[in-house]
Amino acid sequence: MDRNIRDRLESAISKLLLYHPLYGEVFLFLNKIESKTIPTMAVGVIRQVDLALYYNEEFIKNLSGDELRAVLKHEALHILLHHLVRVRHAGYNPRGFNIAADMAINCHILELPKGAVYPKTFDLPEGQSADWYYKSLKDEAEKQKKDLEQMLADKGVDTVDDHGLWGEFDEEIISEKIKNIAESAIKAQEKKGWGDTPGGLVEQIIAANKPVVNWKKEVKWFINKVVELGRRNTRMRPNRRYIFQSPG
């Protein structure tokens, strides 16, 4: 491990914590793992239950300070917007969703390195969610009578980071960890004020982290309570003082 590269990474995270805690806070909860198997940088899962930031030293070495912080913001937003879980939960085509997720993020970040994909690449408006961009890509592929993979290959687009580590993991545990990280990051930014964070992005982050009621679980709990109450009542012997007697 190159100590200078690790120091650059930690310094960039420290600056984000100071000036943009929404992003910097995320990395306090992630393992930092140097890897030569990925060409750039990526958030992913380790041991199926822990989140990690993977980075290639050569990639970081070739970035300016502004570019490094921009890529870190990019990775933090994948966490804050639950993209790791969303692609599996919705059953999306992984490559198609990777491009859609990057379009949703990149239009809010300045100083990204060359090669980043933006909505304008597909003549789409900025400020939409990853799900919206994914549907738009699917619609365009159908219009061209191609499958999504073929259309993206013909366009020659790619992601600025590596999404290959969004593989197998315990979805319930990872979802809970992401929710806790996002809650901490949002609170940290609220203390400082949202500042120059784009309003549309703030709305997406808040919406992605609203508590969701598990109605299936709630209904099951309610039914169990009703059944339990019914059993309890049938076991109770009637009090003779309150037995209704019909006249006559």
Question: What does each model-found stretch correspond to?
Answer:
Residues 107-248:
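Negatively charged
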Residues 1-72, 76-115:
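Basic/hydrophobic alpha-helical interface regions
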